[in-house]
UniProtKB/Swiss-Prot annotation:
This is D-aminoacyl-tRNA deacylase. Keywords: Cytoplasm, Hydrolase, RNA-binding, tRNA-binding. A motif (Gly-cisPro motif, important for rejection of L-amino acids) lies at residues 136-137. It is an enzyme of class 3 (hydrolase). The lineage of its organism: Bacteria, Thermotogati, Thermotogota, Thermotogae, Kosmotogales. GO terms for cellular component: cytoplasm. An aminoacyl-tRNA editing enzyme that deacylates mischarged D-aminoacyl-tRNAs. Also deacylates mischarged glycyl-tRNA(Ala), protecting cells against glycine mischarging by AlaRS. Acts via tRNA-based rather than protein-based catalysis; rejects L-amino acids rather than detecting D-amino acids in the active site. By recycling D-aminoacyl-tRNA to D-amino acids and free tRNA molecules, this enzyme counteracts the toxicity associated with the formation of D-aminoacyl-tRNA entities in vivo and helps enforce protein L-homochirality. It is found in: Cytoplasm. It catalyses: glycyl-tRNA(Ala) + H2O = tRNA(Ala) + glycine + H(+); a D-aminoacyl-tRNA + H2O = a tRNA + a D-alpha-amino acid + H(+). A Gly-cisPro motif from one monomer fits into the active site of the other monomer to allow specific chiral rejection of L-amino acids.
């Protein structure tokens, strides 16, 4: 499982011109599900995202997590995070989970996250327009297999 985590002051997702998700201070997470991801990958990624200390405390030091800050979470499924562009010019997406498995895992991720923080999402497999204001900017890449 891969994620691009961005600290944002605001983020929104539109589908067919309609806002389907919107948050204020929190994290915008693009999440890619790999074909062999398990519950262990899901749990590792969720704990990492919720507890990543990338929010500033009263001294200006990045010392607070999303949970500690009480921030919101925008989750958007993005299979292209699993693209492999090392050969040729067209990325290969063979490592991405098939849509049915990816949706099942993504939905479980959303459900578990929603039990702990306010969550908004995009629409799975829809063409989305994602806009955000990256606060910092702060952007972190995560991989449950630690491949970076």
């Amino acid at each position: 499982m891969r994620a691009v985590v961005q600290r944002v002051s605001e983020a929104e997702v539109k589908v067919d011109g309609k806002i389907v998700g919107k948050i204020s201070d929190g994290l915008m997470v693009l999440l890619g599900v790999q074909k062999d991801d398990t519950e262990k990958d899901l749990d590792w990624m969720l704990e990492k995202i919720l507890n990543l200390r990338i929010f500033e405390d009263e001294t200006g030091k990045m010392n607070l997590s999303l949970l500690e800050k009480g921030g919101q979470l925008m989750l958007v499924s993005q299979f292209t995070l699993l693209g492999d562009a090392r050969k040729g010019r067209r990325p290969s997406f063979t490592e991405a989970a098939p849509p049915d498995k990816a949706k099942e895992i993504f939905d479980r991720f959303v459900k578990k996250a929603s039990e702990r923080v306010h969550v908004e999402t995009g629409v799975f497999q829809a063409h989305m327009l994602v806009s955000l204001t990256n606060d910092g900017p702060v952007t972190i890449l995560l991989d449950s297999r630690k491949q970076f």
